[in-house]
Swiss-Prot record:
Assigned protein family: Belongs to the alpha-carbonic anhydrase family.
Needed co-factor(s): Zn(2+)
Taxonomic classification: Eukaryota, Viridiplantae, Chlorophyta, core chlorophytes, Chlorophyceae
InterPro entries: Alpha_CA_prokaryot-like, CA_dom, CA_dom_sf, Carbonic_anhydrase_a-class, Carbonic_anhydrase_a-class_CS
Gene3D superfamilies given in the database record: Alpha carbonic anhydrase
Organism: Chlamydomonas reinhardtii (Chlamydomonas smithii)
Range of residues in the leader sequence: 1-20
Superkingdom of the organism of origin: Eukaryota
Name of the molecule in the record: Carbonic anhydrase 1
Domain spans labelled Alpha-carbonic anhydrase: 38-318
Active-site positions on this chain: H112 (proton acceptor)
PANTHER family referenced in this protein's UniProt entry, alphabetically: CARBONIC ANHYDRASE (PTHR18952:SF265)
Amino acid sequence: MARTGALLLVALALAGCAQACIYKFGTSPDSKATVSGDHWDHGLNGENWEGKDGAGNAWVCKTGRKQSPINVPQYQVLDGKGSKIANGLQTQWSYPDLMSNGTSVQVINNGHTIQVQWTYNYAGHATIAIPAMHNQTNRIVDVLEMRPNDAADRVTAVPTQFHFHSTSEHLLAGKIYPLELHIVHQVTEKLEACKGGCFSVTGILFQLDNGPDNELLEPIFANMPSREGTFSNLPAGTTIKLGELLPSDRDYVTYEGSLTTPPCSEGLLWHVMTQPQRISFGQWNRYRLAVGLKECNSTETAADAGHHHHHRRLLHNHAHLEEVPAATSEPKHYFRRVMLAESANPDAYTCKAVAFGQNFRNPQYANGRTIKLARYH
């Protein structure tokens, strides 16, 4: 009898979902987001990420040995080991303001994060040290093994987009922060291994503050779309002061890691800033609603069901993260036009946020990796 009752409850729940149901971020039926490869979401914070990308290549989220994020050790631990990046080998950042002309800067809800991209040749960049004498075996992460007096060259890393995670993905000495910003950079010069594109990511942590909203975040948060697979153009004249989003104290921890979302490709050079920026309680709540749980109701009649309309929405040329090529990989076209996939009548649903959400991956084992501290001067 108990089993029969349980089955009846399940059947009633499924029947109820035909009219209204709660969907976690990344699964909303009104989504117009692209689908490439196996579906994934942050429901279990990456613990169930086993699948393949759109080309049929297996993700390495569960098998990789240099995965991100990690729990960053305390300063004293790194100082005690002498694990430091020499001043002359430290990464340098230069980010002028991002300026929208009304269509050149977008805030995108892609069903996995809130992301900012641009369609013009932004002059921002970072420069990363590499060995002065480099060959086809050298990689973007070689700075981790360079000694203070080693002769160095530099490569330019061009930012292609930035996005957010809540709560933070990296931990500092076990501490979790409410928000983390990732600025994704691409390197295509000098190193043979980077001809198809190498990636470096700069992570900025945010801590809650009792004061007013952080004005640096407001142009983004004021334009966050709530619907997955859609974007908002920043109004003409709106600026994002990306350089000021970097902490004034630019001490950072650096290590070799991976993408924090499928396919979790490895070989990335990570920089995690150790001084957090600030975010207000209201801004944090707004972000968590944008990636929150949705209650969706179907407005489609039985007659409509056989006449699903297909919707396609064009985004723009942008750097699309697929996988980090190995030194022997063929060059890939990372800049391409992305068309949001056809969906079975997503407009047949009305959805509203009903609970706060999250979009972070759990920390991964360091597995003996080299982790170094840069004391910025």
